[in-house]
Amino acid sequence: MKRIFISLFFFAFMWTAAGADASPELLFVRWPANPDAVWYSFRIVPVTQHFGRKEMRPPIYEDGHVFRDSVMIEKEITDSYDGPGILCCQVKAIGLDGQSISAYSAPVPMEKAAQEMERYAPKIRVKYHEQNGTVLLYPAYSFVKIPHAVSYEVEITDEEPENPDGCEPSVHRILQGIVTIPELFDELPRQGTVWWRVRGLDENGGPVGVWSEAEKIVNDPAENWETGILGDSISHGGGRMSYSPADWPYNYAYYLDFPTINMSRSGDKTEDLLRRFDADVLPFHVRYLLIMGGTNNLRCGGTAEEVISDLEALQEKCRSGGIEPVLLTIPPIAPERILKYYHQPTAENWKAEFDKVNGWIRTQTHIDTAAPFAMYEDMPENLAADGLHPDKEAKEKMGKIINEKFPEIRKKISETKIQK
């Protein structure tokens, strides 16, 4: 498994540092994200004035499939324009089925909206470890694409790269991956400190420009995390097909009142959680572990008994390691949309099996994260567009109920220990 409004349109501006002798070649434009958008259509239009009225001419540049809320274009596009009017940019939000879900925004002059980028390289979109919900043991590397690149090489290093302005691999490389979309999910846990960066590649695999600036990720057991999260992609984060775990508003941990280290991994079944527990969870010596799992088992034909057995084993592992397990109930899914977007059938008895697992979880130390959706047979489209991954609003609801119930659980656990 995998993944404000434009009517109040204003642009956020960002710089990327580069070498002193570099000349600006790219323009970077970013706009406030529409949480319902899957992608955007971006265009540059000349705007003229006649008798005080603005008139828009045909676009000089248009990209109908911009991934997420920012774009980079070549500066030459605007520099070479010698026609009438002022060049302005507009965006509109596109939905899951390719339909427009907003009108084009009001035109904003490019001289205000665009930032010159002196490094011809992809731009890293997110920073880790800055606020609640932004610490992932399994990172997602997300970036903004550049013109002329047909694929991208993501490099992970165990020391800061020695060639920040080059295009050769670092001598400190520990992993690399090639992608055609602007993100890569790490399949391995990143414990300790690593750096990552990305460069564009042409159709022959040669470099387009240079490496992006390297970003540091720290997942240090010495930071003494009190609370961890273990689960599949519902806990890992992401949603609405195009948003990854690095898009923090699509992660319920982002809405929590307390810091967490997220040890979840997209695609996991409960047996996977059990298998990687010792290596991924124990080194961090957390006091509490929020556990959600079973969705992938049950939708693919697994039984409630198998899931419950794995969850019981996870509870035992936690207690043996001095960790208090807190189980989370699993929210409903929508099989029709899972089939439509992922071409995966769902077991016909999924609902009954979900109910069995959630019924058992409610007899344990738990938080009922499925409760906000109890009135639905299937998860509605506005809460999980793809039928599988809860979107921003649903993640907020899950975070809210965890915030409400977790202090009570902590208090009860403390009182029980005192009595003993």
Label every PLM stretch briefly.
Residues P335-A371:
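Substrate-gating cap/lid alpha-helix
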Residues L96-E116, E203-N219:
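Extracellular fibronectin type III
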Residues L273, T365, N382-K420:
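Histidine-centered active-site loop/cap adjacent to the catalytic His
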Residues S242-Y243, P249, T270-D310, P331-P335:
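Oxyanion-hole/transition-state-stabilizing segment in secreted/luminal serine hydrolases
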Residues G206-S266, R275-H285:
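Serine-esterase "nucleophile elbow" of acetyl-processing enzymes
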Residues D79-Q99, L188-N204:
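Beta-strand-rich modules
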Residues R43-I86, I156-P189:
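Recognizes extended acidic, P/S/T-rich segments that occur
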